[in-house]
Amino acid sequence: MATKIRCTDEVIVLTGKYKGKRGIVIAIYSLGKAIVSGINIVKKHQKPVPALNKTGGIIEKESVIHISNLTIFNTKMNQADRVSFKTINGKKVRVFKSNGQTIN
């Protein structure tokens, strides 16, 4: 089954601490989770590894967020939108539900 949200899509967060924030999807995992740039920032306490010449400290990085808390952002209409699928020339493509425009 094709996913409605893919890597490099611009999404908006629907619920939680980051509600209303937008970001670009960096990675999608099989358990229905995604990493979005600038969203769900956590602090990781990293130990130094002298053998690999890595310094320790507190590192801020993006953590996973469930896909059900995200929706795709339609930049043409400047609002959150839903996704449907259509078959065009024998190919299954994603389209916005509000205006029927294809998503690249």
From Swiss-Prot:
HAMAP family listed in its UniProt record: Ribosomal_uL24_B
Alphabetical GO biological process terms: translation
Record-given protein name: Large ribosomal subunit protein uL24
Organism annotation: Baumannia cicadellinicola subsp. Homalodisca coagulata
UniProt keyword list: Ribonucleoprotein, Ribosomal protein, RNA-binding, rRNA-binding
Molecular functions per Gene Ontology: rRNA binding; structural constituent of ribosome
Gene responsible for this protein: rplX
A Pfam family hit: ribosomal_L24
Family to which the UniProt record says this protein belongs: Belongs to the universal ribosomal protein uL24 family.
Primary role: One of two assembly initiator proteins, it binds directly to the 5'-end of the 23S rRNA, where it nucleates assembly of the 50S subunit.
